[in-house]
A protein has these predicted regions:
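AMP-dependent adenylate-forming
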Residues: 21-47, 561-568
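Structural core segment of the AMP-binding/adenylate-forming
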Residues: 23, 65-66, 93-161, 539
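Conserved pre-ATP/AMP-binding loop-to-beta segment of ANL
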Residues: 31-33, 150, 164-188, 195, ...
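Conserved AMP-binding/adenylate-forming core of the ANL superfamily
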Residues: 34-89, 106-111, 163, 203-204
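ANL superfamily adenylate-forming
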Residues: 41, 128-180, 287-337
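Conserved AMP-binding A3 loop
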Residues: 46-50, 184-210
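Conserved AMP-binding/adenylation subdomain of ANL enzymes
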Residues: 207-226, 233-332, 345, 370
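Conserved ATP-binding/catalytic segment of the ANL
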Residues: 400-467, 484
Length: 602
């Protein structure tokens, strides 16, 4: 199958925007809880739609009073917490455009986003974040930024007080300012080269996709459903699901620190969660290690095999009686305990950001947690395709959501069209033009469609590394910084589907003798000996540390290995134009790479 298009389930009027989702929920007699926050006692307290609307409007009035104009850009730099969504919707109620910033970003990264977007203000979480923003503003002498409001300080109170004089009519006019075709947010994404590009996502992208997404996933997103958000809201995946929950009247709680995730799952008891494959890997590995430590390793492995076999049989449409009996037994011995660790009520999980793999998909389905894997990019407001409870094929990323279309180009590239696709790249009509072919967005990924319209991802056209936690990393930025030192010949950053970033480094055989002499080391030291010498290792570590200052913590190189033989054209690791053949390096040095990840503490 070359292409598939799925018609919309929900038609949305053109003069609608994201604020209408909140207003609609607040007008319902049921007044559903849209968010839950931890009170002083540690108990979860619901925030109803009417209460959320009131809080959002109070902050929006403050933004208007502070001089934020329709269409102005306002940044948000914070961990995943209630105030993130409060600020996001307040920006929309004021007719402005929100610009997410990862809270781990360096001042240089923040400076680029603030200056490129022309942000007039920024919401930040803490004094630490405020310092980064102020350093960024000073770094590039950014004059547009007039305000910084801190969640942990009195930023929101300042806005509420400032907004007392803003009348209802002004707010109402601002709220109605944007239609479906207007920009709601600019999300900066890691390009293959150069600076991050700002993806312009419209109110239509969010509203049409969330309305149709909720209609396609009624078992998951509905009034009374509860989820706990722990992925960064700066990432389009978590952000979109947050808006989808408002559209569906589901309740969202937040865990800013993943260390608290397990206790929070147990106290909040979500009905569905949103995660990246790394989370499912951790749940599986922790359960296995716990079983092995308790002398029950055999039970775990047997139970895992039964879960996978049961899921495969269930998907094929027939479960043999013997397997049913074994499955029921392990449900009591093992599966129930894993579900209880996740709060006991989780029935569905939505997975994206990186491939899950069908083994984990079948394992979780087999223990009673249906993992719905989807696929998308920042440029497609997250999901182009997703598996749904009614239409699921484990090992694929599902069929297109209603309103979306997928085509496979002649070279295998996945092309996308529909309500999910961005307007373009901010200030970059040249890049926008390159990103589309005949009206179809070029994803840069390679895949195939089966006869039922389910998409499978088979490879990446681009070189961007996606870690197991879904973080996009541009290898060239780090590699170039490390290669800048004469002692280094080549550097290959590793980390695709891995828990962290590492690097393979080779030494420059011509530069080595001079370096040895300067450091009073024996001239006869071979490259292989130098690769293990403490002085050389210390020098490379210093280079790595310096390179790491240009990126966020999640993108930083945690471990490196010096490889004794250089990567050259003769060894088959360089092209004639001296470009690294990554796949060949990873293949030839797979044992080194495996040793990095098997010995390192995650």
């Amino acid at each position: 199958v070359r292409d598939i298009s799925v018609p919309v389930l929900v038609d949305v009027p053109r003069q609608t925007n994201t604020t209408d989702l909140v207003v609609r929920q607040a007008a319902k007699p049921s007044n559903p809880a849209l968010f839950a926050v931890k009170g002083a006692s540690g108990d979860w307290e619901n925030i109803s739609a009417t209460e959320f609307r009131r809080q959002v409007e109070d902050v929006a009035k403050g933004l208007i009073a502070s001089g934020v104009q329709p269409g102005d850009r306002v940044a948000i730099m914070a961990r995943t917490r209630y105030e993130w969504s409060l600020a996001d919707f307040a920006i929309w109620f004021a007719g402005a455009v929100s610009v997410p910033v990862y809270e781990t970003s360096s001042p240089a990264q923040v400076a680029w986003i603030l200056s490129d977007s022309g942000a007039v203000g920024a919401f930040v979480e803490s004094a630490r974040h405020e310092n980064v923003v102020r350093e960024a503003v000073a770094l590039e002498d950014i004059e547009s930024v007039q305000h910084v409001w801190q969640f942990d300080g009195d930023g929101l109170d300042t806005l509420r007080t400032a907004g007392v004089g803003t009348d209802e009519q002004t707010l109402s006019d601002r709220r109605a300012y944007a239609g479906l075709d207007d920009i709601a947010t600019i999300i900066y994404t890691s390009g293959t080269t150069g600076k991050p590009k700002g993806c312009e996502l419209t109110h239509g992208n969010f509203v049409e996709l969330s309305e149709n997404g909720a209609a396609a996933l009624p078992e998951v997103a509905h009034e009374g459903a509860q989820t706990i958000m722990f992925l960064p809201l700066a990432h389009v995946f978590a952000r979109f699901i947050s808006v989808l929950c408002v559209a569906a009247g589901a309740t969202v709680a937040h865990t800013p620190d993943v260390k608290n995730l397990l206790p929070d799952l147990q106290s909040y008891k979500p009905t569905f969660i949103l995660a990246v494959p790394r989370v499912f890997e951790k749940v599986y590995n922790n359960s296995m290690l716990k079983a092995e430590d308790g002398g029950k390793g055999k039970i775990f492995h047997a139970g895992a095999d039964v879960a996978i076999a049961w899921s495969k049989a269930e998907q094929a449409g027939k479960i043999p009686l013997g397997l049913k009996v074994k499955h029921a037994l392990f449900d009591r011995l093992l599966y129930g305990k894993i579900r209880t660790a996740m709060g006991g009520r989780v029935q569905h999980a939505v997975s994206g950001g990186a491939p899950l793999g069908d083994r984990l998909g079948h394992f979780f389905h087999g223990i009673g947690l249906m993992v719905l894997e989807g696929y998308g990019l920042t440029e497609t407001t997250a999901p182009i395709t997703v598996n749904t409870p009614k239409r699921i094929k484990i090992g694929t990323v599902g069929a297109p959501l209603p309103g979306n279309a997928v085509r496979i180009a002649d070279d295998g590239e996945i092309l996308a069209k529909g309500v999910c696709v961005m307007k373009g790249y901010f200030n970059r009509p040249d890049l926008t033009e390159e990103a589309f072919v005949d009206g179809w967005f070029r994803t840069g990924d390679i895949g195939e469609l089966d006869e039922d319209g389910f998409l499978s991802i088979t490879g990446r056209k681009k070189e961007i590394i996606v870690t197991a936690s879904g973080k996009n990393v541009i290898p060239a930025l780090l590699e170039d910084a490390i290669r800048a030192n004469a002692l280094v010949s080549q550097c290959v950053v590793v980390g695709d589907q891995r828990p962290f970033i590492s690097a393979l480094v080779t030494l420059d055989e011509e530069a080595l003798p001079g370096w040895l002499e300067r450091h009073h080391l024996p001239a006869a030291t071979t490259t292989a000996e130098a690769a293990e010498h403490p002085a050389v290792l210390a020098e490379i570590q210093e280079l790595v540390d310096t390179a790491n200052t240009t990126v966020s913590r999640a993108e930083a190189i945690k471990v490196f290995r010096i490889v004794p033989t250089d990567f050259t054209e003769a060894t088959g690791h360089l092209t004639p134009s001296m470009k690294i053949k990554r796949a060949q390096v990873l293949k030839d040095y797979s044992d080194v790479v495996e040793s990095i990840y098997s010995t390192a503490k995650v």
